[in-house]
Amino acid sequence: MTQNIHQHRILILDFGSQYTQLVARRVRELGVYCELWAWDVTEAQIRGFNPNGIILSGGPESTTEFGSPRAPEYVFNAGVPVLGVCYGMQTMAMQLGGHVEGSNEREFGYAQVEVKTDSALVRDIQDALSATGAPLLDVWMSHGDKVTAIPEGFETVASTDTCPFAIMANEEKRFYGVQFHPEVTHTRQGQRMLERFVRDICQCEALWTPAKIIDDAVTRIREQVGNDQVILGLSGGVDSSVTAMLLHRAIGDRLTCVFVDNGLLRLNEADQVLEMFGDHFGLNIVHVAAEDRFLGELAGENDPEAKRKIIGRVFVEVFDEEASKQTDVKWLAQGTIYPDVIESAASATGKAHVIKSHHNVGGLPKEMKLGLVEPLKELFKDEVRKIGLELGLPYNMLYRHPFPGPGLGVRVLGEVKKEYCDLLRRADAIFIEELHKADLYNKVSQAFTVFLPVRSVGVMGDGRKYDWVVSLRAVETIDFMTAHWAHLPYDFLGRVSNRIINEVDGISRVVYDVSGKPPATIEWE
């Protein structure tokens, strides 16, 4: 019988910080299961989850404003350790009888806090020593309000010149508050502090490991589907690929993968997917060549959001047609991951705005009447990749740069035509090949080529001709929420440009996108 990898668990209450998912990922990296819930949960929900500890996230609100989010009172009566981060510390302080005020100056960026009192949270953790021998910690602050009086039973553990209560603690109740963000890498000892809280103070064992997650997923898949047949849409992306490998391990030949070649994939990608999963791993794959159908539906359409919806709709139609040909299929597998679940929950409660329609969640054909199998729905992307490695998938496939669900459909600006896709595929392949050769591919977060539907004059031999323009795009980012354009070497860009213009007949000009996010998005459409 497999071990219960969910036995030890942390509950993270989300107050709206851009870093909240990062807190959850850091806890998972410690080998401990956690879930991320909205701050306004009920006592019954918390009791049902039965956490070993609770973390209150940061957030953009002010605890001094009427109606600002508060932690459920039960959090402080549950008898488990609680860690408040930034806003989480402020609401803890205010709700337990302390005081919070708006600060004259917002503290944002690097700070050094001085530890004044021994605490289980930071004992023997330091970056340096002060002139008086006190431990110093390099941390990342991002707050306007600050705690000006701590609740009864708490001690001041650490402070800065402008923040008198950078860390507070009630050791008896195991309540801790930090005014900085331990989850970001700028807080150099942040992961050690989280480890101290999760592993030592909450006494959680490291049960959440790739090998154990695989064993648990295989067991749960077998329990869920029994001897039934399962169908999966395999795209060759990370999520569907790892889903396919997990299901194949669990049920073998009772999995059928439908691979839809929509004509919007990268150069030779369809052949690579079929060779890897069909020939090498031995999965049952139904290959559907649907380029003409997709491009036919996209003809004449220039609007990016409309293109996304057409691509999503046609995929569902094609997949549904193929699924109906499979006899005795009872289950549909999807590569939904935990951030998809969080995002969908936020949309359902009206707490999120749709920037671009999501291509994964919500694409289930209602008329199919199949049960849903989602073996990755508890996992973050980095966990999915680690599991993929454990299952034998190649590193270079799992750690490829992100590729949008609609594929080249949103990298060809305006109307999508086969001619444009073919030119873009070849240009993009040259860019990616040169990034690898120059050892730059893994130094940028995402790189790709965009086809611009404008003609530009060029000189070839003794003649002039008007051909198409492509733009190279490369960005550096930690979380894809913000991004800087990558400062690639000029000689490298020149080499890529020369190769594209000389080797791809039909392209006469190559430009480089130097827009950051914000104001631009990473993808052009």
From Swiss-Prot:
GO terms for molecular function: ATP binding; GMP synthase activity. ATP binds at residues 235-241. Residues 208-400 form the GMPS ATP-PPase domain. Keywords: ATP-binding, Glutamine amidotransferase, GMP biosynthesis, Ligase, Nucleotide-binding, Purine biosynthesis. It is an enzyme of class 6 (ligase). It comes from the Bacteria. Catalyzes the synthesis of GMP from XMP. GO terms for cellular component: cytosol. Pfam families: GATase, GMP_synt_C, NAD_synthase. Its EC number is 6.3.5.2. It catalyses: XMP + L-glutamine + ATP + H2O = GMP + L-glutamate + AMP + diphosphate + 2 H(+). The active site is at 86 (nucleophile), 181, 183. Pathway: Purine metabolism; GMP biosynthesis; GMP from XMP (L-Gln route): step 1/1. It comes from Pectobacterium carotovorum subsp. carotovorum (strain PC1). Disulfide bonds: none annotated. InterPro entries: Class_I_gatase-like, GATASE, GMP_synth_C, GMP_synth_GATase, GMP_synthase, GMPS_ATP_PPase_dom, NAD/GMP_synthase, Rossmann-like_a/b/a_fold. This is GMP synthase [glutamine-hydrolyzing]. Homodimer. PROSITE patterns: GATASE_TYPE_1, GMPS_ATP_PPASE. Residues 9-207 form the Glutamine amidotransferase type-1 domain.
